[in-house]
Amino acid sequence: YMIDEAKKRGLDDTFAREAIYKYGEDIGKEMYNDMKDPTDMVEFSKHFGTGHHTDIYEMETVASDEEKLYIDFHYCPYVAEWIKQGRNPEEMATLCEIAMEGDRAIGETFDAFKFTLGKTIAQGHDVCQIRFDKKK
């Protein structure tokens, strides 16, 4: 609803993107500082996508090695709520892009990794594909 209220006041969604990005930066910096080697993808995999998030998002690690960390989310509580709110597919795709600013920021904290968002549940797919690849 925050985006809806902002639109009523003549604001675009930039404020939300920036705020969520900053939140992701904070998380990324904390992860970075907790790691012995922030260029080590295996160590990164022990920090990203762990804890209670694995259950909430029904996360499945589909690939994890020195070169990549690929995680599929099989559930998104945001999309579930947006559906209840009656959001159309275009709105959900935009809201998802905004919400993913946090993960983008986490990825950009690590110079050695490239973050990619693949398919998303908000786009109508059955998974959200979170991908981190080691830069060559």
Can you name each region flagged by the protein language model?
Residues 94-107:
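A conserved amphipathic terminal alpha-helix motif
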Residues 1-97, 113-136:
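N-terminal accessory segment detector
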